[in-house]
Amino acid sequence: MEGIKFNQIGVSFKGSGSYVPDQILTNETISQKVDTSDEWIKSRTGISERRISGLGDNVNDMAYEAALSAIEMTNWDIKTIDLIVLATSTPHDLFGSAPSIQAKLGAHNAVAFDLTAACSGFLFALITASQFLKGGSFKRAIVIGADQLSSFVDWNDRRSCILFGDGAGALAIEATNEFDNFLGFDMRTDGERGSFLNLPSKNNKDLIIDNIDFLNGGFSPIQMNGQEVYKFAVREVPIILDNLFRKTNYTSDEVDWLILHQANQRILDSVGDRLKIPREKILSNLAKYGNTSAATIPLVMDEAIRNNRIKQNDIIATSGFGAGLSWGAALIKWG
C-alpha cells in the first residue's frame, strides 16, 4: 500500500511526549543472571541499559503519561481531541487499552482504539491517524506507542533478554487547511517470514465437564531469529526509504534527521550508510532504553524535540520494522 497525496487537508505536528519507568536494568545486572557481559551486549547491540516496569507500572499508565506530556506541549482543550490511536502489542486489557487512556485523560469526545503491529506499530498508527485527519473525519489526534515487553521475555535466553525495555511515547497531530507536513508514507508486510520474530499464543488444556475441553489462553515468551531479522532490516529499510524519497521528490541530502525503530545500533548505522545519511543525522537513544517496540520512535523524537535538536520545519525520515514481518516509512516536516 502506498500513500496518496491529499491537497485539501494537511497534517500539522503540534506536540510530543514520552514516559519510561524509573527502574533501570543494566547490562551488568543481566550478566549476573545469564552468561553474558556488558562488553558483549554493547558490542552487538549498542545497548547499555533499559527501563523495566515494576509492580506499579502498566501500559495504560505509561501511555497516559506520554499522551498527557504531548498534550501539554500544545494549547489544546482536551475536549477538542477527537481521536486516540494506541499502538501496542502488550495491552493492559486484551480487549483494548486505548479507551481507558481516553477516560483517564478526560478526552470524552475522542474515539479511541488499539492498533497492533509490534515494532512497526507506532508508524502504522501515525499513518492511520494522519489519513483519518486528511480525510476530514477528525481534527485532533493523539498517537501513542507503548509496550511492556519485559513481561514476555524469557530471562534465561541471553539472545533476547538483553534487547528489550519498557516505555511509551506520543505525538499530538492536527488537521489544517494551510499546509501538509505529513509528506508521504509507504507500508509493507511479509507474513511468510513471520516466524523470524513472534510472540505466539500458548494454550493450556483443562478438562472441565466430561469430554469438553477448555483452553486456558496465554502466551509463550518472545521468539526471535536474530540473524534473519538483522538481514531483513538492513535490506528492506533502505529500499522502502529510498522509494519514499523518490515518491515525494526529496533526496536523502535534504533529510535533517533519520529516526529508525531502535532495534540494534548496527542496524541503524547500516541503514544510514546505505542511504548515505551521515551518522550525526541518525537519532538514537538505544543505549539508554533498549528496544521498547512501538515506543522507540516517539521516545527518540520527543527527546530530540525537548533537547532542541529537532526544530520547526526540520525534515524527518522515519521507519519502523519488526514482527509480522512488517515495515513502513514516513517523511514528515516537524511543526
UniProtKB/Swiss-Prot annotation:
One of its GO terms (molecular function) is 3-oxoacyl-[acyl-carrier-protein] synthase activity. CDD domains: KAS_III. Pathway: Lipid metabolism; fatty acid biosynthesis. The keyword Lipid biosynthesis applies. The active site is at C119, H261, N291. It holds the Pfam family ACP_syn_III_C. GO terms for biological process: fatty acid biosynthetic process. Catalyzes the condensation reaction of fatty acid synthesis by the addition to an acyl acceptor of two carbons from malonyl-ACP. Catalyzes the first condensation reaction which initiates fatty acid synthesis and may therefore play a role in governing the total rate of fatty acid production. Possesses both acetoacetyl-ACP synthase and acetyl transacylase activities. Its substrate specificity determines the biosynthesis of branched-chain and/or straight-chain of fatty acids. NCBIfam families: fabH, PRK09352.1. This is Beta-ketoacyl-[acyl-carrier-protein] synthase III. It comes from Prochlorococcus marinus (strain MIT 9312). The gene is fabH.
